[in-house]
Amino acid sequence: MPRIHVLPPGLVNQIAAGEVVERPASIVKELVENALDAGATSVGVDVEEGGLALVRVADDGSGMDRDDALLALERHATSKLRDAEGLAAIGTMGFRGEAVPAIASVSRFRLDTSAGEDGAGTRVEIEGGVLGEVAPVARPRGTTVEVRDLFFNTPARRKFMRAASTEAGHVSEAVIRLALARPDVGFTLRSAGRLVLGARAGGGLADRAGQALGREAHRHLLPVDARRGEVRVHGLICSPDHSEATGRALYLFVNGRYVRDRAAAHAVLRAFAGTLPPGRHPAGVLFVELPLHRVDVNVHPQKLEVRFAEGREVFDALFHTVAGALRTAPWLRARPQPGDGVPAGNGGGPAPVPVAGEEAAEVLAWARAARPPEGSGATLVQPAPGAWATGRLAFPVAPAPGAGPEAGPRPEGYFAALRYVGQHARTYLLCEAPGGTLVVIDQHASHERMLFHRLREAFRARRIPVQPFLLPQVVTLPPAAARALEAGLAELGRLGFDAEPFGGEAFAVKGAPAALAGVDLTALLTDLGSQLAEVERGSAVDDAFHDLLATMACHAAVRANQDVSPEEARALLDGLDAIDFKARCPHGRPVVFELSLADLERRVGRR
């Protein structure tokens, strides 16, 4: 049996390099983080052949004297940590003292550094972990590290590297993440002598985000900033008018450190629920700040993952901060508010959208309370007189006798300022905006969004207005949907349905949400049963309620190829200004299309 023995230091460093040095981008990350920890105000990165031939990182930080320069090459030697208490509340980017010796063990490594203002510095050279020349060198205060011929002594590692262009892309992404975290520091990145990134110090987060996300995304950035308990979330998020095919354009930072956290990313995606088409993802730059002792950064070799003491608190802070910003921000792109005379976002400050609670109160005011079904959070009501329209559009119309569609005061807002022209193809509402812009509104998508908003807010208040039936309505469902619905009767009650099994695949429905008057209950309950079958019991069901409510709103909304009176159209337009996320239906489809007068005139040859 082989005897146990202690590995030589060089081999230990190469093993450590297997965790720390995944690719050239890992080296860039570690060296730039060291520069930032040293107080650098300017960092320059140069790479050749994607970093395989050369990685050079130069900074103007505090630098090191000769003794510290040599000590920095020893494993577990660091200036950033002294005891266990410090590890529990680490605030620097690096702290383990592993990266530099690990990098030096798999490359031809040179370190030039100076800690004084006299121009005297130190040069240390290492080849494959073996110390070479240590000599004085003239240089200004700061540090320059050159890493050449990465993995020259570990060919098995080098053969797993991708093409130089691929590795250069990873290096660029690493520098972008670091530049986003520190807008106060200047960054340059050159690849094969070509300037890839130039970010001046103090330009602001919006400029950095524009460089990272692109010019189109920059036009849609919204500021977010809120605190919940000890957690603050701030940064910039793109409105739903701009989305990405993957989640890579969402940059999340915890106490200044870029992290990959699936729960945090999911919280942001949840905040966008119903505003993005399926398969699309939000983009933005978000910072989470919380006390250092409440987050453990020592759980991943490259510190890309963290562990929170209270993960739910961080999830809630992200969700509510982003959702609140989307709810109140004027993200109907370049759409003027009445009385402003300027596009939203260009000054003048459009009126804020009413908060969710106000809308919920309006919904609940439509109905008078009665006996709640046993075991549910819903409230049985009779619809208030005039509360519902003709059975097609479930929102208040009730104009004064003889009043036309333009009569009476209306709420201020984008939709209220539109002049209703008429209905096209019994599907689209045609309107004229101030300035002559043609506005086309999808009647189903817009009504669906309004119904969804009201159902959701009433659901959150646990008081969905419910219409009891004089006689139970018996519906028969497909077997799979019936089984799922029977298992999910409690969830069905929370949605405002009073139903019970009636033998086989049949259910006796004694009441349903008042907003769904006239809906085909068989079709609706079949869809709800199918959705319930796809989720597990417990917390996952809460995540699914958005989709369930969206399905209910879709079934109840006015359809395409259905007549809408001018009064109903006017009431719909006025009502849209009082809800959030009005630019898209709950499934993410656009509600509004605009054609400016200038574009129209160009189309017909007037310009």
Curated annotation (Swiss-Prot):
GO terms for cellular component: mismatch repair complex. Keywords: DNA damage, DNA repair. This is DNA mismatch repair protein MutL. HAMAP family: DNA_mis_repair. GO terms for molecular function: ATP binding; ATP hydrolysis activity; ATP-dependent DNA damage sensor activity; mismatched DNA binding. The lineage of its organism: Bacteria, Pseudomonadati, Myxococcota, Myxococcia, Myxococcales. PANTHER family: DNA MISMATCH REPAIR PROTEIN MLH, PMS, MUTL, DNA MISMATCH REPAIR PROTEIN MLH1. This protein is involved in the repair of mismatches in DNA. It is required for dam-dependent methyl-directed DNA mismatch repair. May act as a 'molecular matchmaker', a protein that promotes the formation of a stable complex between two or more DNA-binding proteins in an ATP-dependent manner without itself being part of a final effector complex. Belongs to the DNA mismatch repair MutL/HexB family. InterPro entries: DNA_mismatch_repair_MutL, DNA_mismatch_S5_2-like, HATPase_C_sf, MutL/Mlh/PMS, MutL/Mlh/Pms-like, MutL_C, MutL_C_dimsub, MutL_C_regsub. GO terms for biological process: mismatch repair.
